[in-house]
Amino acid sequence: LDLRGNGGGLLRESVNIVNFFVEQGTPVVSTKGKIKDWDKEYKALSTPLDTEIPLAILINGGSASASEIVSGSLQDNDRAVILGSLSFGKGLVQNVRPLSYNSKLKVTVAKYYTPSGRCIQKLDYSHKNKNGKANKVPDSLITEFKTANSNRSVFDGQGIAPDIEVKRNLLSNISTSLLLKSLFFGYATEFRLKYDTISSAKDFSLSDDQYENFVNYLADKDYEYTTESEDLLVALEKAAKDDKYFDDVKTEYEALKNKLNHNKKGDLYKFKDEIKFILENDIVTRYHYQLGQIEASLQHDPVLDEAIKTLKDTVLYNSILAGTNK
């Protein structure tokens, strides 16, 4: 189940999804409020579809609310391996109250708790800082809980932590700049006007000539960025000046600065694989829309690759759920 970027939905549907994979009567989620009326427990009510099929759940920082109920419940019941990165941490139950003048008020009435008893809420709105911003639950208050069958350790106050963390590769500064300036978007639009059709979403790939066209397209475009090395060099200069060493190393500093100065065109080739992948996804969207973009992105997806690897490795998969994998 790919729940990355899934911001949630209906509580009942999250219970129904979990019910596909666990025995009837299995606890799925509970809610607890300041008044007893909001204390409820939800269990799997129907006969499951399959309680044995190996199951992997993909999550990230955009997985929230109902999607965290699904992933957290299946993790707590030792039914699925969770992969990706820490989820959003939205564990609040909210109720909408009508007000005058056709307006409404959304009121938090309870919190969600997964079967182990942990609350997935990450921000503590009852203790805000002086700027009125909610703080994360401090490490000192994070509590350990245990899964139902294997007695594995899971923790509250931080969303859902994956069993296998797959770190996201950060974009290069040049790619970030091109995104912020909508230059991928602009070229993809021009590409769509020039070519009536392309191959299927999973097979589409820019030719070297087409990538050269993109490089030429950027020649007169305004985009600026600094590299991480250049940022560190600026910090080094400040530190050296503060410590009164800069005059002694100024010649060496200037030589290093000249060596590290980025070259836009050179970086377009240095980070070609990354830039080409982003551009191809943008172009595919013009022809095959959102479903096509998803299909194309899965061709180079480290989280999906790790999930497939885990599902194929029965020993690894079972050891994770049994809590014996170290």
Regions found by a protein language model. Give the residues of each.
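Polar, glycine-rich mid-to-C-terminal structural blocks
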Residues: 66, 78-79, 83-85, 89-152, ...
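Conserved functional hotspot residues or short segments at active or partner-binding sites
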Residues: 119-326
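Amphipathic alpha-helical transducer elements in NTP-driven molecular machines
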Residues: 11, 15, 64-71, 106, ...
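Terminal peptide-recognition signature
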Residues: 1, 21, 55, 74, ...
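Structural recognition of the beta-strand scaffold that forms the well-ordered cores
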Residues: 2, 28-30, 54-59, 81-84, ...
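Bacterial peptidoglycan biogenesis and beta-lactam-recognition machinery
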Residues: 22-32, 65-66, 75-84
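Gly/Ser/Thr-rich loop/hinge elements
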Residues: 9-62, 92-98, 113
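Short, glycine-/small-residue-enriched flexible loop/hinge segments at domain edges that mediate gating
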Residues: 1-9
